[in-house]
């Protein structure tokens, strides 16, 4: 299941690895591996754009712009912001669901962000190694075809769980305006059984936004850092689908 790669610079190509696809098999000695399929990459960038729109519009909804003079119909800025927030939320929900469905039919790497192999001691040993690497306590990085164990843990908790929470609470809040007969209320109205006070749901939804802001900043930093320091492609891999090992 683990897809660690530690290609030695003086090692020759491994023919078995060259014949392997990105299904989780080792790819020692292979400079380029096709990892992220097109649906994974499309969902990644659509979700990323949607989350950015949701963050900006969500912040403005929580901290509205100053009131301006004149007819409301002539100054509908907050209305447009609210509409953009709702639209981006529905786009995120559709592509997040698509991403989940693709995990059932895609390759091994398409499933990594949806689980953590908590029962595997080796996984946690490699998580600790990655923490030491990010803390500049390790001299050499380990290379992986897909996500490294720390990244897999971060993606599962910081993306999968957080985004699911935001979608559920977001649609629950949206159902208040749609009414109890709406599909949003029928699917997500149970949230108010947990937090009967609507303001509590607003508060948790707002806190979730800031948690995602932190995750996005760490995610971008880690991707850029690994692209430079670990000598393997990270950012371009989510464009081309291929992981390149430079050393």
From Swiss-Prot:
Keywords attached to this Swiss-Prot or TrEMBL record, sorted alphabetically, are:
Cell membrane, Electron transport, Heme, Iron, Membrane, Metal-binding, Transmembrane, Transmembrane helix, Transport
Residue intervals passing through the bilayer: 42-62, 86-106, 154-174, 204-224
Superkingdom of the source?
Bacteria
Q: Which GO terms describe its biological process?
A: respiratory electron transport chain
* Compartment(s) of residence: Cell membrane
Q: What SUPFAM superfamilies does this protein's entry cite?
A: Transmembrane di-heme cytochromes
Pfam families linked to this entry? Ni_hydr_CYTB (PF01292)
GO CC, alphabetical? plasma membrane
Membrane topology type: Multi-pass membrane protein
**Function recorded in the entry:** B-type cytochrome involved in electron transfer from hydrogenase to oxygen.
Q: What is this protein called?
A: Probable Ni/Fe-hydrogenase B-type cytochrome subunit
């Amino acid at each position: 299941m683990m897809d660690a790669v530690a290609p030695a610079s003086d090692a020759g190509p491994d023919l078995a690895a060259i014949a392997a696809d990105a299904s989780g098999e080792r790819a020692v000695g292979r400079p380029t591996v096709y990892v992220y399929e097109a649906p994974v990459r499309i969902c990644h960038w659509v979700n990323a754009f949607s989350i950015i729109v949701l963050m900006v519009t969500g912040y403005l909804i929580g901290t509205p712009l100053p009131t301006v003079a004149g007819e409301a119909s002539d100054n509908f800025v907050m209305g447009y912001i609210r509409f953009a927030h709702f639209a981006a939320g529905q786009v995120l929900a559709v592509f997040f669901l698509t991403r989940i469905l693709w995990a059932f039919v895609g390759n091994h790497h398409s499933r990594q962000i949806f689980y953590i192999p908590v029962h595997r001691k080796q996984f946690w040993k490699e998580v600790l190694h990655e923490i030491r690497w990010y803390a500049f306590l390790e001299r050499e990085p380990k290379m992986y075809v897909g996500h490294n164990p720390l990244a897999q843990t971060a993606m599962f908790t910081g993306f999968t769980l957080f985004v699911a929470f935001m979608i559920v609470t977001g649609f629950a809040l949206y159902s208040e305006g749609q009414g109890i007969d709406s599909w949003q209320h029928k699917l997500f109205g149970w949230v108010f059984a947990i937090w009967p006070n609507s303001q509590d749901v607003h508060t948790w939804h707002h806190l979730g936004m800031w948690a995602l802001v932190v995750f996005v900043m760490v995610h971008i930093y880690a991707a850029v850092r690994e692209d430079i320091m670990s000598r393997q492609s990270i950012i371009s891999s989510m464009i081309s689908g291929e992981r390149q090992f430079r050393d």
